[in-house]
Amino acid sequence: MKKDILVRLANSPAKLAKQAKLALLASLALLAFLVTSCVSQEENPDTPTGNFEALWHIIDEHYCFFDYKDIDWNQIYQTYKVRVNDNMNREQLFEVLTDMLSELRDGHVNLYTAFDNGRYWNWHEDYPTNFSDTLQRRYLGTDYRIAGGLRYRILDDNIGYVYYGSFSSAVGEGNLDEVIQHLMFCQGMILDIRSNGGGDLTNAEKLAARFCNQKTLVGYIQHKTGKGHNDFSAQEPQYIEPSSNLRWQKKVVLLTNRGVFSAANEFTTYMKCMPQVTVVGDHTGGGSGLPFTASLPNGWTVRFSACPTYDANHNQTEFGIDPDYNVALTDEDFNKGKDTIIEHARTLLNNN
């Protein structure tokens, strides 16, 4: 007997359709969805062992980073199968399944239940933060401007400072026009996305389009074409088209840290393709696989990376992106009320 397990994009198809002009990567992910939307699999009972088997097979057939991360998923099956029995309660099953998913070392992998969410946060928790809300408030002051999800002001050395804390916070074309107009006479721009954990990829694309003057290759994407670990389509190029609105023509320093993940990681990939952009700070947190979701027999939902993306040089960015200048926040500067990373960016812009 067969059962269709629905695999769907984390973002709704209606939203993707509405924003299709900018959603370059999301559009291709939708194509992958159409190809693999129904996964035919042996029906598993709603028991702890049945849910374990269902989860293992979903990941086995659809996860996209097994080879890149050198993960032996069959060995992991043997390791965790002995921990599962049909007499365990839901909390015990949740713990085993979450532990198994943690072997993927992927911040895009989650197990959602009514009572808890399984997650993997080592991609940023094991590293220095290199960002301080207290210090940032010293630079923004109290009279900063707000445009959608952006906070911005002109620093005292005529450098524009813009902070974007989450790509889940909407930013409109009018917002971006206002920011660029306000900063147009500045020496340069500091664009701070530290601790931006991602969000809506269309916001990342919309913002990146304000920094390019021609159609720019920013990376590649693949989607799964079969159940094998290496069953992928050919890499398909991804481009950013220049905005038809105001575009920033001066130097930009992009600030990053380990908290930059998912859509923010992709945005960093885009910006590294722009000739006037320099990246300063720490290695990003990664998260380059576009996430899909699937359901277990008991109704729990698993999210996982299904479509790998690459930078313009065909490199994986799942484990993050190196800055052009690796700069850490120092205790000495912190005690002086200075942000080492912002100060390094100011020096670069003032010396150019």
Residues covered by each model-derived region:
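Flexible, low-complexity junctional segments that flank or bridge functional domains
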Residues: S37-K224, H229-P237, K251, T293, ...
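Bacterial Sec-dependent N-terminal signal peptides
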Residues: M1-P45
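Alpha-helix termination/capping residues and helix-transition junctions
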Residues: A32, L183-F185, L246
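C-terminal "post-core" interaction segments
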Residues: V39-E53, E91, N158-I159, G197-N352
